[in-house]
């Protein structure tokens, strides 16, 4: 719609002008700034605006074109709004769909496979999934990826924890080290390991400091990944396209190190190998190889980003926990030293989540020890409610909410309020024994201001999607759907629909609103309720 409106100005201005929405709805649907174009044409701004209004006044797409304080304001015609309303109703879930845009590799969650997902992981998971859904819908080729940290000490520690828990189940002596994974899930895993490997496998006493049973480690890691995949499914996160193993990538370390050395990125000091990351905005240089010759965690990330950039996407997006903020500069420095463009990498941060229940801190999971598990909260409030609340704010801001509020069945609960708008409209159509698309042949005409405002707001949907994706802010879509639901409830409470003289026109407007709400919620990974 915006492109078509802007296109009407192109012949007169020489380019597609920027369109904005007037703050006051009485000033129309769109506004075009005039001063720049008057100056380019060496004309008085008022005279230039008046001439432009005269030239565009006969366009069938515009009901009114007028000059106001340096802007040309446009009010769209009923027939133009009807044209786009028909697109909504006929294209259904394909409305606002695009194609042929950038190829993007989006990596998110990438939680260590040492336990089930906790609530902090869930926010990043929902954030990433919403970005992927919206991006794909509007035409970006978004490939999603989960980086499996299966090469570090944490995997050895997982295997050790399972081994010792198995010995404890078998009634054997156990000396627990200071650091290990605890919780019911480790005990469950240990019981399963006894069945898998047999009791004799766990009878040997081991030195916890030097334990490294790769067979048990990998078995436990795979079990944890399956658990994580169950949590991802429970959150209604779209299955990942790629699962990339850190352990497999380490086979390329010598090759990657050779590239870094050739490009002058490394030096030795104090028996360690350092990356010259301070040359690229990092506060200091970073160790990539320890004194004992083992690569650091950073080395693994360098290999991974080398592998990513070799795949030649147009853009790379990583979603990290906010505690990784200090890590950004060193990774971008490594990318630069590898000969790639670090500006192609965007790193988005997902902040902490604080959960309450009845005003009190949400209870930690007995199953995981000191974490709140995704699976527990999903059982408590459902995936849709949890996804919605995660998408009400920018991901890089702190989020605190009470799960009891998510179960409230009134207008104070935004998720309920939006769904109620959809269900309310669907109920009207069920009573009329009509489908939404049955209204496509009804002509929108003689629209009142309330009617015009509501249908115009619904038709802002494609623009909202673009802004939500380009800015990596899916909460813009959430806020828009809440605004649309509010406008609908206000309209419906003030205007009679069934039995009114304008029943058909109003049914069509409601059909458009319901269609947009359903599609919008689906792009947030939420199912619109048909009945409430």
From Swiss-Prot:
Cellular location(s): Cytoplasm
EC number: 6.1.1.19
Keyword Chaperone attributed: no
Span of the signal peptide: none
A GO MF term: arginine-tRNA ligase activity
Motif 'HIGH' region: positions: 111-121
One Gene Ontology term from the biological process aspect of the record: arginyl-tRNA aminoacylation
Reaction catalysis annotation: tRNA(Arg) + L-arginine + ATP = L-arginyl-tRNA(Arg) + AMP + diphosphate
Assembly, per entry: Monomer.
Family: Belongs to the class-I aminoacyl-tRNA synthetase family.
Protein name: Arginine--tRNA ligase
Organism of derivation: Nautilia profundicola (strain ATCC BAA-1463 / DSM 18972 / AmH)
Gene this chain is encoded by: argS
């Amino acid at each position: 719609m915006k492109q078509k409106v802007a296109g009407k100005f192109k012949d007169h201005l020489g380019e597609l002008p920027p369109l904005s929405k007037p703050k006051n709805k009485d000033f129309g649907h769109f506004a075009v700034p005039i001063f720049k174009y008057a100056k380019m044409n060496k004309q008085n701004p008022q005279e230039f605006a008046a001439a432009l209004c005269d030239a565009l006044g006969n366009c069938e797409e515009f009901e009114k074109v007028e000059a106001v304080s340096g802007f040309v304001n446009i009010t769209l015609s009923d027939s133009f709004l009807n044209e786009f309303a028909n697109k909504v109703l006929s294209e259904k879930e394909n409305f606002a769909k695009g194609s042929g845009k950038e190829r993007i590799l989006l990596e998110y969650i990438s939680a260590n496979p040492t336990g089930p997902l906790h609530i902090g992981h869930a926010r990043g998971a929902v954030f990433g999934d919403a970005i992927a859904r919206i991006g794909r819908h509007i035409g970006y080729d978004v490939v999603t990826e989960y980086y499996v940290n299966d090469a570090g000490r944490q995997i050895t520690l997982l295997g050790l924890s399972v081994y010792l828990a198995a010995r404890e189940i078998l009634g054997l002596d156990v000396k627990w080290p200071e650091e290990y994974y605890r919780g019911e899930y480790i005990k469950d895993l240990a019981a399963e390991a006894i069945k898998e490997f047999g009791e004799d496998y766990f009878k040997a006493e081991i030195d916890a400091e030097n334990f490294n049973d790769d067979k048990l480690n990998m078995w436990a890691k795979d079990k944890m990944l399956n658990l994580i995949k169950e949590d991802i499914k429970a959150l209604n996160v779209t299955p990942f396209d790629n699962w990339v193993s850190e352990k497999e990538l380490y086979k390329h370390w010598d090759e990657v190190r050779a590239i870094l050395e050739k490009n002058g990125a490394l030096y030795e000091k104090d028996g360690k190998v350092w990356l010259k990351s301070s040359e690229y905005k990092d506060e200091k240089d970073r160790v990539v190889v320890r004194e004992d010759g083992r690569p650091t965690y950073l080395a693994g990330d360098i290999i991974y980003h080398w592998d990513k950039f070799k795949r030649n996407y147009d853009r790379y997006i990583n979603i990290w926990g906010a505690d990784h903020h200090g890590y950004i500069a060193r990774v971008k420095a490594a990318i630069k030293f590898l000969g790639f463009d670090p500006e192609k990498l965007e790193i988005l941060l997902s902040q902490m989540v604080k959960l309450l229940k009845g005003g009190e801190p949400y209870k930690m999971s007995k199953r995981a020890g000191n974490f709140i598990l995704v699976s527990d909260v999903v059982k408590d409030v459902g995936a849709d409610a949890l996804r919605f609340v995660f998408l009400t704010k920018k991901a890089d801001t702190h989020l605190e909410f009470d799960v009891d509020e998510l179960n409230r069945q009134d207008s104070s609960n935004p998720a309920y309020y939006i769904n109620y708008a959809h269900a309310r409209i669907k109920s009207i159509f069920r009573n009329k024994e009509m489908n939404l698309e049955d209204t496509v042949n009804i002509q929108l005409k003689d629209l009142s201001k309330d009617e015009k405002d509501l249908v115009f707001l619904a038709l802002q949907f494609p623009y909202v999607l673009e802004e939500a994706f380009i800015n990596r802010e899916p909460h813009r879509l959430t806020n828009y759907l809440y605004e649309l639901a509010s406008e609908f409830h206000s309209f419906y409470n003030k205007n009679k629909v069934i039995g009114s003289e304008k029943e058909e026109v109003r049914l069509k407007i409601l059909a458009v609103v319901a269609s947009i709400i359903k599609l919008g919620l689906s792009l947030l990974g939420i199912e619109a309720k048909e009945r409430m």
